[in-house]
From Swiss-Prot:
This is E3 ubiquitin-protein ligase MIR1. Pfam families: RINGv (PF12906). The keyword Ligase does not apply. Residues 104-121 are extracellular. Residues 195-221 have a biased composition (Low complexity). It catalyses: [E2 ubiquitin-conjugating enzyme]-S-ubiquitinyl-L-cysteine + [acceptor protein]-L-cysteine = [E2 ubiquitin-conjugating enzyme]-L-cysteine + [acceptor protein]-S-ubiquitinyl-L-cysteine. One of its GO terms (cellular component) is host cell plasma membrane. Its EC number is 2.3.2.36.
Amino acid sequence: MEDEDVPVCWICNEELGNERFRACGCTGELENVHRSCLSTWLTISRNTACQICGVVYNTRVVWRPLREMTLLPRLTYQEGLELIVFIFIMTLGAAGLAAATWVWLYIVGGHDPEIDHVAAAAYYVFFVFYQLFVVFGLGAFFHMMRHVGRAYAAVNTRVEVFPYRPRPTSPECAVEEIELQEILPRGDNQDEEGPAGAAPGDQNGPAGAAPGDQDGPADGAPVHRDSEESVDEAAGYKEAGEPTHNDGRDDNVEPTAVGCDCNNLGAERYRATYCGGYVGAQSGDGAYSVSCHNKAGPSSLVDILPQGLPGGGYGSMGVIRKRSAVSSALMFH
């Protein structure tokens, strides 16, 4: 029974000992492997990812020492033929370049030229076309011989593998990093009588309710109620990126950072954004803001839908509370 509990390498089936190494996200028996065995297997197979969990290996390709290199790897018939033609064209190009240079220096450009100007012009034209043929021919064969070069590199290189470093799966902005803050009170027409302990904003809420109760906001809290015209104007935000609505009736009220499409969901109209870690939402008769401490990520625009439905489908999770229940959820990547 003890022998079965000893971890063994899934490649060579030998005990790991102190050479235990994890290279991918596999667990169980497939987690145990020798680093040298995996390096040899990746060098031969040239795989870049685990075929089971799909994790890309953390590897590095290095060239073997010069004394260990193989000058002529084992090639197929087609690869050998292409190699012979390539060597022939290389030799032809080098010989032609040497001959053209010699003619140009000693026959055409010498002190006593042996050809006239017409023959020299013809020679120049031939030299230009010959060099173009050699250059384009070499380029074509270089393109055709990519797999030959890969075969040579596969024989003379080896793969070094490094430990697996899993990426964090937790969202960038966790729920505990979200602050919920009511920045504008709700209207009187939306709150009804509620039981004791109702959330701030109910008509008959408990003592010490937050600003937004019927009795009025706390001292110093900005008061701003949207009229029917402003609610209708809120539905006119067609393009994401337009600034949110602020009709200027209260200079102390600042609009949210960026506005999105305003969804007409009956009495619930929201527009929200996640911009550098800040989330702002505004309804037809009140406004809320959600501040995220994690100032990370590019600007992403989202819509907030009621009943916890993700509007924009973007990243980390935050919630916007209305009354005593969670009526909206913000999901953004």
